[in-house]
C-alpha cells in the first residue's frame, strides 16, 4: 500500500496488516526479484507516483497522471530501458472539444496531464541510448487518438534527431483492451 493511501479507512479495513507493506516515495523496496522505486508525479489527485522497476539487468519506468515532467522525474526517464508514459491529449482537440473551460484549464495545467507534444519533449530530452521501447498510455477518448499521439511524439523526436523505429520503438497502448505480453530484454 502506498503511504499516501495507507491512512484510507477503506484500505485499512480491507487489507490485513500482514498483507500490506507501506511504501514511501523515493525509497526503493524489493518484491521478489524486483527493485521498485516509487517517485512523485505532479497531478491534482492525492499523492500520485510513478515507478522505476529493475530486474535482471532491465529498468522499466511507468509514469502516468503527469501534469509536467519535473527535474526529479527526469533521471527515471534517463534510466529506463523501457518506458510507459502518458500522452494524454492534443491541446487543439481539447480547446475545440466539449470540455468546460475549468476542466480544460485543469488538464492543461502543471498538475493535469501531459500533451502529446510535451510527452515527446520529455522523451527526447531525457532518454538515454539504452532506451529500447516507449509505450504511450492514458490517451483521452475525447481529446486524442492513437494515430495522432504517435505521429506527434514521433515528429517531436525527429526534431531532436531521434528516429522512432530506429533509435527505439514507439507504440500506443490501447485504452480499454489488454496488451499482449512483451519480453523485456537487457
Task: Indicate where each model-derived feature is located.
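Glycine-/small-residue-rich active-site loops that bind phosphorylated ligands and cofactors
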Residues: 1, 43, 69, 141-142
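Short glycine-/acidic-enriched loop or helix-start segments at secondary-structure transitions
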Residues: 6, 11-12, 48, 72-73, ...
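Short, flexible loop segments at boundaries between secondary-structure elements
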Residues: 167-179
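Cap/insert and terminal regions of metallo-dependent hydrolase folds
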Residues: 71-170
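Active-site HxH/HxHxD metal-binding segment of metal-dependent hydrolases
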Residues: 1-28
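Active-site neighborhood of phospho(di)ester-bond hydrolases with catalytic His/Asp-centered motifs
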Residues: 1-5, 61-64, 84-86, 134-137, ...
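Core dinuclear metal-dependent hydrolase active-site scaffold
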Residues: 24-82, 177, 181-186
Amino acid at each position: 500500500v502506498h503511504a499516501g493511501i495507507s491512512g484510507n479507512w477503506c484500505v485499512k479495513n480491507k487489507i490485513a496488516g500482514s498483507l500490506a507493506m507501506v511504501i514511501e516515495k523515493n525509497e526503493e523496496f524489493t518484491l521478489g526479484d524486483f527493485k521498485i522505486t516509487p517517485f512523485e508525479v505532479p497531478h491534482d489527485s492525492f499523492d500520485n507516483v510513478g515507478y522505476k522497476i529493475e530486474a535482471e539487468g532491465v529498468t522499466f519506468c511507468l509514469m502516468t497522471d503527469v501534469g509536467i515532467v519535473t527535474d526529479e522525474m527526469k533521471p527515471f526517464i534517463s534510466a529506463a530501458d523501457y518506458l510507459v508514459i502518458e500522452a494524454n491529449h492534443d491541446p487543439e482537440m481539447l480547446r475545440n472539444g466539449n470540455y468546460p473551460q475549468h476542466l480544460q484549464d485543469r488538464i492543461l495545467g502543471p498538475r493535469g496531464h501531459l500533451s502529446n507534444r510535451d510527452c515527446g519533449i520529455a522523451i527526447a530530452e531525457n532518454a538515454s541510448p539504452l532506451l529500447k521501447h516507449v509505450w504511450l498510455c492514458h490517451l483521452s477518448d475525447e481529446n486524442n487518438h492513437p494515430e495522432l499521439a504517435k505521429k506527434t511524439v514521433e515528429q517531436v523526436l525527429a526534431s531532436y534527431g531521434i528516429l522512432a523505429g530506429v533509435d527505439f520503438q514507439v507504440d500506443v497502448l490501447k485504452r480499454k483492451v489488454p496488451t499482449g505480453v512483451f519480453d523485456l530484454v537487457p
